Each structure stands twice: as structure tokens, then as C-alpha cells.
């Protein structure tokens, strides 16, 4: 994923101001700072990124995890997601980086569509990885670019070679296309939900339940 972040910086420009969630995944801030781009912190509230703070932050790019925020676990509701998209629409140079890591294993509540899936104006860069869903040894991350940024990527960064072998890419593609990945996610989600319920039940039955 670190390489994906660096490609995004090169694509969007080091003259842009990147905003990250506060609190948030500290590694992201360090990557931006190490690549000599201005990085500002946007506080979160009970629904995710605070819109008033975002508007006052003078950021060009917002990097967030709306479906499974780290470290709070907050899931941004659909109304706030549309507000965030509205912020991006107010300026041509604004974009949103939707980091959807670990969103597949949300165990409570109804599914909420990703920002990218409800974006009709090409303002969202979607990124994810298979490290959590399949195995830490599968070092494959990806990003989905809006049409206009895809064209810019081809013009500016098409000289980069993929660090993942063709064999791994084709194998993973076949695994997805044949429906095995979706079945795997569904089975794993059920397993994790059972494990969570057993853990909570054990805590409730513990003599220490009143203080945990």
C-alpha cells in the first residue's frame, strides 16, 4: 500500500495539501511527510470526518477510511458521505482518497455503499488490499481511478512496472471472476461474527464482567 500512496502523490502533485483523519493511521501521515507534501489533520466526530473542520482546513485531497476508521471503528453514515462528496465538488482540484482497508469484515449494521460507488462526478480514488481478506503474504494492493485521473496516470506514470508477478495477478483474477473470493468473504464474515459473539459471551459470564 505504501507504493500506492506514493503513486497518488506523484499523480495529484506535491503542491497539493493532503488532509488525514485525527486520530488516524499514523503511517499515512508519515508517508505524506516523507514525500515532502503538506499534510493537515482533520478531527473526527461520532460520524467520521468533521465537515466544518474539513471546510476550514484548506485541503485539496482528503484521505479517509469511512467504512472502518482506525482506531475508533467508526462507520461514516450515508448522509455524511454525501456531505464529503459535496466538499470535493466545490473545487475542481479536490479529490477524496477512500482507503477501504478491512471494510469487508464489518460485523454490525446494514452495509453502507462506498464513497466511490455513489460518486457520479469522478472525485473519489478508491484503494484497498487483499492482505486482510486473504493473507498477509499476498502483497497486492490496488486503486481505482476516476476516468480523468486514469488518463493523467497513463500520461505521467505509465513507465512504472508492477511489482506483483503476472502469475499472482492472473491467479487472483481467476479466483475473483469465478466467485470464490465473494464466497470466501461471506464464510469468513460468518466465522468472525461467531468468534466475536463467543468472546462477548465469555466476557459477560466472567466475574470481571462488571469492570471490563
What are these regions (language model features)?
Residues 1-5:
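Short, small-residue-biased leader/transition segments that mark boundaries at the very start
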Residues 10-26:
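Conserved PLP-anchoring active-site segment centered on the Schiff-base-forming lysine
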Residues 16, 37, 90-94, 122:
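A short helix->loop->beta-strand "cap" motif at the edges of active sites that frequently abuts
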Residues 28-31, 202:
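A generic "structured core" feature
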Residues 38-45:
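Short beta-strand->loop structural element characteristic of the AMP-binding/adenylate-forming
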Residues 46-107:
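Active-site phosphate-binding strand-loop segment of PLP-dependent enzymes
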Residues 124-205:
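PLP-dependent aminotransferase class I/II
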Residues 208-212:
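Conserved PLP-binding catalytic core of the aspartate aminotransferase-like
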Amino acid at each position: 500500500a505504501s507504493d500506492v500512496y506514493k503513486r497518488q502523490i506523484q499523480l495529484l502533485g506535491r503542491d497539493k495539501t493532503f488532509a488525514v483523519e485525527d486520530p488516524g493511521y499514523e503511517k499515512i501521515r508519515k508517508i505524506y511527510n516523507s514525500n515532502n507534501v503538506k499534510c493537515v489533520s482533520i478531527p473526527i466526530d461520532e460520524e467520521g470526518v468533521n465537515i466544518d473542520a474539513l471546510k476550514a482546513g484548506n485541503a485539496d485531497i482528503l484521505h479517509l477510511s469511512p467504512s472502518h476508521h482506525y482506531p475508533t471503528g467508526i462507520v461514516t453514515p450515508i448522509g455524511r458521505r454525501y456531505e464529503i462528496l459535496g466538499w470535493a465538488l466545490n473545487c475542481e482540484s479536490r479529490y477524496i482518497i477512500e482507503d477501504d482497508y478491512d471494510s469487508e469484515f464489518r460485523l454490525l449494521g446494514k452495509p453502507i455503499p462506498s464513497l466511490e460507488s455513489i460518486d457520479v462526478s469522478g472525485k473519489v480514488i478508491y484503494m484497498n488490499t487483499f492482505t486482510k481478506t486473504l493473507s498477509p503474504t499476498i502483497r497486492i494492493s490496488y486503486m481505482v481511478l476516476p476516468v480523468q485521473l486514469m488518463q493523467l496516470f497513463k500520461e505521467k506514470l505509465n513507465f512504472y512496472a508492477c511489482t506483483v508477478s503476472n502469475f499472482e495477478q492472473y491467479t487472483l483474477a481467476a479466483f475473483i471472476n469465478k466467485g470464490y473470493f465473494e464466497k470466501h468473504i461471506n464464510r469468513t464474515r460468518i466465522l468472525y461474527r461467531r468468534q466475536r459473539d463467543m468472546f462477548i459471551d465469555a466476557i459477560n459470564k466472567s466475574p470481571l464482567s462488571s469492570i471490563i
